[in-house]
Amino acid sequence: MSDDAAVEQSLDWIVNYENAEHVPVYIYDGITRKERTIIVPTMEELLVQHCIVNAMKPMFCKGMYEHSYASLPGRGAHKGKQVIEKWIRTDPKNCKYVLKMDIRHFFDSIPHDRLKAKLKKTIHDEKMLELLFRIIDVTEVGIPLGFYTSQWLSNWYLQGLDHFIKEQLCAVHYMRYMDDMVVFGSNKRVLHRMRQAISDYLEIELGLELKANWQVFRFSYGNNQGRDLDFMGFRFYRNRTILRKSIMHKATRKARKISKKEKATILDARQMLSYLGWIDCTDTYLMYRKWIKPCVSFQQLKRKVSRYDKHDEKRVYQKLVSLYTAKGGKSHGVELQVRREHSPADCI
């Protein structure tokens, strides 16, 4: 089979794939035990979704607000942390007050009709639209949390909100981390008016609702006056940044569990190294030295992950080839390129 024929066959397979039957998985997240409904994609669906996102990235990234973070390459929580630290330490006048808010049941509430209408205005390829609509319709309401396409579609859906806040409301410092948002300002009344305008925009333009627990408060200053900002897993003060307590507790519990095992698993190693990435970029070394360092050897964990990763790409390649050939494709004459994309900042 020629390369052109193989590519054509692969495209036909992607365009004509059908959604699998899904059983929702319920997880209870964080110390608040918040219930989340996850739709776990099959290997076939995951492969198709990655192909779609790779093709659609130019559209998703065009016009994206520069301080929109989460689930985007190079835009994890650590990058957002650096930006907020720069704002609060170099421009204290415009960071006197904070408006903190998020969207109620964001993924579960995105209206299909509005999302599809927005896609129709931008995409003129009927096959791509049909494929995207098929994925969106996996759930009757909202978009499926757990699908690779969902994080890109949801970020893209809120682009208009980002530009409304920055350009029409003239927010000096504004950041969005998926559906969590913060706006810094010098005037409390102005932030309250912004909050109302944002709430109206969400309802009228996007069919979404601002959660009722929004806050406007005086940011940390002087000798323990004002409040710290809890955002993206960090707690920001005027002169330091520490980890959110819940994340630090998870890290210490994981370290203690590993210390009681004869041998750490690869999942243990990855999770603990992810926590180390968070600890390294915050002012929490004393807590790390007291509670975590005595329990685990990070050098051993790094070696374990390194050894595993040497064989991981080969296993993924073989699985993709098996899936492709099982669907009627020919593996000979076709080279599958497997590229690992991950951001340590998004591991929590």
What is each stretch, according to the model?
Residues 1-115, 124, 137, 141, ...:
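Conserved two-metal-ion catalytic palm core of "right-hand" nucleic acid polymerases
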Residues 4-6, 117-122, 165, 242-256:
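Compositionally biased, low-complexity linear motifs
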Residues 9, 13-14, 82-178, 182-200, ...:
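Conserved polymerase palm-domain catalytic core
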Residues 29-31, 60-64, 97, 177, ...:
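Short acidic (Asp/Glu) and glycine-rich catalytic loops that position anionic groups and cofactors
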Residues 35, 39, 43, 68-71, ...:
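Generic amphipathic alpha-helical segments used as scaffolds and interaction surfaces in large
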Residues 46, 50, 138, 192, ...:
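Right-hand nucleic-acid polymerase module
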Residues 199-208:
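A common structural junction motif
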